[in-house]
Design a protein with these regions (language model features):
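Short, Lys/Arg-enriched N-terminal segments with co-localized hydrophobic residues
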Residues: 1-29
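Conserved short hydrophobic patches within well-ordered secondary structure
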Residues: 3, 63-64, 113, 135
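Short hydrophobic/aromatic-rich motifs at helix boundaries and adjacent loops
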Residues: 5, 71-72, 105-109
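Context-gated lysine
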Residues: 17-18, 24-25, 38, 42, ...
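Charged, low-complexity C-terminal accessory regions
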Residues: 26, 33, 165-169
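Conserved P-loop
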Residues: 31-101, 157-159
Length: 169
């Protein structure tokens, strides 16, 4: 009888443990876009979203910018990364590798914000489709969300109408 009770307790524990571990894997991760021409408040909207996200997130929130400008309004809980500090990251592939390395080094990252994505490395409207595909892959593999701001009208961004992307404006 004791062995039976022990087995039931262990099975219950393992079942509960498995459901806790699979929660993060079952959550649907996504690439979210904020679009619009220069001067339409995309950066401020991204900062507000990051500040809200850090209050409700169970993981770490990262905010990637080109420069140190306007980072003072970010909540102290948001990890700000300025790409000026990494001048050798010049290509889209290097930038994607940087993201993979960041996620591999910190499995607690829940959300990554990338402000002014067209100013990062050599990302342009010509190759943003490939970049967003890479983000979707990273998002799915690591169950994290991306929020990116693009300094262009929604209509000028190729392949934006995919189920993998959510346009917020």
């Amino acid at each position: 009888f004791e062995n039976l009770v022990w087995c039931i307790i262990n099975l219950s524990y393992l079942s509960r443990k498995k459901s806790q571990n699979t929660y993060k894997k079952e959550r649907f991760a996504m690439v979210n876009l904020i679009t619009g021409p220069k001067g339409t408040g995309k950066t401020q909207q991204m900062i507000e979203l990051a500040n809200e996200k850090v209050k409700t997130s169970n993981g770490n929130v990262v905010f990637i910018k080109k420069s140190h400008r306007n980072t003072t309004t970010l909540d102290f809980g948001v990890r700000a990364i300025c790409m000026e500090d990494y001048p050798d990251i010049l290509t889209m592939d290097e930038f994607v590798g940087f993201l993979y390395g960041m996620v591999a080094g910190n499995h607690d990252i829940d959300t990554i914000f990338i402000d002014s994505v067209l100013k990062q490395a050599d990302i342009s409207l010509n190759n943003i489709s490939a970049f967003m595909t890479s983000l979707s892959k990273i998002s799915a593999e690591n169950t994290l969300d991306f929020f990116i701001s693009v300094g262009a009208e929604k209509e000028s961004i190729p392949d934006i109408d995919s189920d993998n992307y959510n346009v917020l404006n």
